[in-house]
A protein has these predicted regions:
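A domain-level signal for the structural core that forms small-molecule/cofactor-binding pockets
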Residues: 2-63
Length: 63
């Protein structure tokens, strides 16, 4: 049973997450020759204040 964990910044819509897990499941099934009901996907959303790039919090990053 494949278990995949995805970390992503908060802000994606439910529809986007549904599409993501659907596409990932299809790819995993194809690559690993498993059934969709065997695939587990964990989405972990990270707030912008809990993520840093180049030593700067993403929430404080200038565009």
């Amino acid at each position: 049973m494949p278990i995949v964990q995805v970390h992503l910044l908060e802000g994606r819509s439910t529809e986007q997450k549904k599409m993501l897990v659907s596409e990932m499941t299809a790819s995993i099934c194809l690559a690993l020759e498993v059934r969709p009901e065997q695939v587990r996907i964990i989405l972990s959303e990270i707030s912008h204040g809990d993520y840093a790039v180049g030593g700067e919090l993403f929430s404080e990053k200038k565009s």
